[in-house]
Amino acid sequence: MKEFDQLLSVESDAYISSKEQGIDDGKRLGYVEGYQLGFEKGIELGQEIGYYQSCVTVWNHLVSINNNNNNNNNNNKNNLKFSVRGIQNLEKLTKLLEDYHLDFNDENIMNTLSEIRLKFKLTSVQLGLQTKENDELSF
């Protein structure tokens, strides 16, 4: 009778060992897929922040050139090409980007990124400068 019980338990033993092996394989595969996804998202995040930083650098340079030209023209404020609000928002955006660090343990990293995105759009509109986002139609 013992032999018959062992024969019946073969199926359940195979089920249990297969389940454990599947869990181990799933953990391993999940780690690899998670690593790849994190790597891709990290690259996208870095590209986005780099784009914002490069735009802000160029805009700050344009504002400084504009200010130098205005100072050479007898301080005539009517020659301003950029709005005061736009320049103020550019300063705030510059500060946000300087303070932004890619610390993935920080839970507010995405909140700060969305704040940078909003400030970037607002600043580009107020300064009247073209960006790649403005080139695309939005319906």
Swiss-Prot record:
Signal peptide: none annotated. Coiled coil: none annotated. InterPro entries: Essential_protein_Yae1_N, LTO1_adapter. GO terms for biological process: protein maturation; ribosomal large subunit biogenesis; translational initiation. GO terms for cellular component: nucleus. Belongs to the LTO1 family. This is Protein LTO1 homolog. It comes from Dictyostelium discoideum. The lineage of its organism: Eukaryota, Amoebozoa, Evosea, Eumycetozoa, Dictyostelia.
